[in-house]
């Protein structure tokens, strides 16, 4: 969800309750567990508040989509099936997601913060997304909401400065909030300008060791990979 545009039309995909209907009673022999992908947008725009899996849902379109998406798995949970709601942050990958879209302006020397730059972005590498999925599948004690984000959320200002440094380019040309809204409408508020300072408490407490916990190293690895 963090790497794809979310629109009111695509939000209808959250109406997937029927796919989780399992009949009456528990299914003790079922060994395939649904992993429901959501995102930190579940928490809404929360400023610099530290957010964990126990934090309440926020308000707004994207928060509503995430909440409805997770609620669609309730029939499976009610049937006794272990369900994991993986709330995946902004994915750092050279092959897709947010990073390739950001590289061009920065390579041209016209990149910079978005809006005030004070909004927190909760990010994660694709390598750790895959690692987290394997971890929650193998660890049967993990269920419910799991924040799949790196343990070091950063402000957009720090993110863009770190990206510029990794490319050896300046990051002094900000995108004003109004320009982001002109380009993306309400999605700018939900995806770029909102602040979600999310921490992966359940992954860490269940023993997952992040492969790329540091943003600078993660960006350098992705940018320099061949």
Locate the predicted segments by residue.
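Conserved beta-loop-beta element that borders a ligand/cofactor-binding pocket
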Residues: 38-39, 71-94
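Glycine-rich "substrate-gating" loop/helix at the edge of Rossmann-like oxidoreductase active sites
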Residues: 57-62, 89-96, 116-126, 137
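Alpha-helical substrate-binding/gating segment
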Residues: 103-112, 119-154
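Glycine/proline-rich active-site loop of Rossmann-fold NAD(P)-dependent oxidoreductases
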Residues: 47, 66-67, 79-81, 92-101, ...
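C-terminal amphipathic/interface module of NAD(P)-dependent oxidoreductases
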Residues: 190-226
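Conserved Rossmann-fold NAD(P)-dependent oxidoreductase catalytic core, especially the SDR/UDP-sugar
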Residues: 1-60
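Mid/C-terminal beta-alpha module of Rossmann-like enzyme folds, strongest
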Residues: 139-186, 220-226
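Non-catalytic, hydrophobic alpha-helical segments
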Residues: 129, 133, 148, 159, ...
């Amino acid at each position: 969800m963090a790497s794809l545009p979310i629109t009111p039309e695509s939000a209808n995909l959250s109406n997937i309750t029927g796919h989780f209907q399992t009949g009456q009673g528990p299914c003790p022999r079922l060994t395939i567990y649904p992993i429901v992908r959501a995102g930190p947008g579940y928490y809404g725009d929360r400023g610099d508040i530290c957010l964990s899996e126990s934090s309440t849902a926020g308000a707004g379109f994207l928060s509503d989509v995430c909440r409805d998406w997770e609620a669609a798995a309730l029939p499976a949970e009610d049937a006794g099936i272990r369900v994991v709601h993986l709330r995946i942050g902004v994915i750092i990958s050279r092959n897709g997601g947010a990073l390739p879209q950001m590289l061009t302006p920065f390579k041209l020397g016209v990149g910079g913060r978005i809006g005030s730059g004070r909004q927190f972005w909760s990010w994660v590498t694709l390598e750790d997304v895959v690692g987290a999925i394997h971890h929650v599948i193998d660890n049967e004690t993990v269920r419910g909401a799991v924040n799949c984000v790196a343990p070091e959320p950063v402000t957009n200002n720090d993110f863009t400065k770190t990206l510029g440094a990794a490319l050896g380019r300046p990051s002094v040309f900000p995108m004003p909030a109004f320009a982001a809204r002109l380009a993306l409408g309400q999605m700018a508020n939900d995806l770029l300008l909102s602040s979600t300072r999310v921490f992966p408490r359940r992954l860490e407490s269940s023993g997952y060791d992040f492969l790329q916990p540091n943003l600078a190293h993660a960006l350098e690895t992705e940018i320099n990979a061949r």
